[in-house]
Amino acid sequence: MAVLLGVCNWVHPLLQSPSCCKELKEAGIDAIQLDLGSAEEDFPLSSPGIQRQWKEEAELYGIRLDAVAVLAVLKHGMTAEPGSERRNTAEKAIAAAVDCAADMGIPRIVLPSFKASAIRNKDDLRETARCLRLACALAKHRGIAVATENLLDVTMMKSLLNIVAYDNLCSCLDLSHFVLRGREDVFEALPEHLAVCC
């Protein structure tokens, strides 16, 4: 398995422009994860012009466009009531991310379960599973993987994967989220967590 050093483009304003690819390459960065952008701005990464710029710059400097992150679900929760404005917006963001990934040749989308999409109880888990199932159904026929990023322990993560029951669903494990919340127990089950990562 090859290891790539990557960065998320929302962590610093300078990384939000495709022109950052040159500096990333010079710094030894191999890959970048792109944010779809906000619903209020009509998901900027959906723009063909912006997509073209990212693809051209990434190809020129050998930077892998690794994933489309759907940060819009941090505000418009996947756990919101089905049919509500927030849930509808989350589902539109998911569909837009799948389209972007397919159009740009990006292999996966990432759906974070934090803030408005945090999984706090069984109802949240059920609604998250429904959104993940929608994402997987949209993504599967386009050859796109769906990564869920959350704070579930390994038993609950495996349960979520089984509930959704799509082979294009996997886990995106960011250990910093666990450490920042005092959840060092994740390290005890690290091999099991890594087994379901994409």
Q: Can you say where each PLM-predicted feature lies in the sequence?
A:
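Histidine-acidic metal/acid-base catalytic patches
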Residues: 1-6, 13-30, 59, 105-106, ...
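A cross-domain feature marking catalytic cores of carbohydrate-active enzymes
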Residues: 7-11, 34-38, 67-72, 111-113, ...
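A generic secondary-structure micro-motif detector
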Residues: 9-10, 43-44, 87, 125
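A broad, structure-centric signal for solvent-exposed, well-ordered loop/edge residues
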Residues: 14, 19, 41, 72-75
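Short coil/turn linker and secondary-structure boundary residues
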Residues: 15, 46-49, 82, 184
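Glycine-rich, proline-tolerant flexible connector loops at the mouths of alpha/beta enzymes
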Residues: 33-58, 113-120
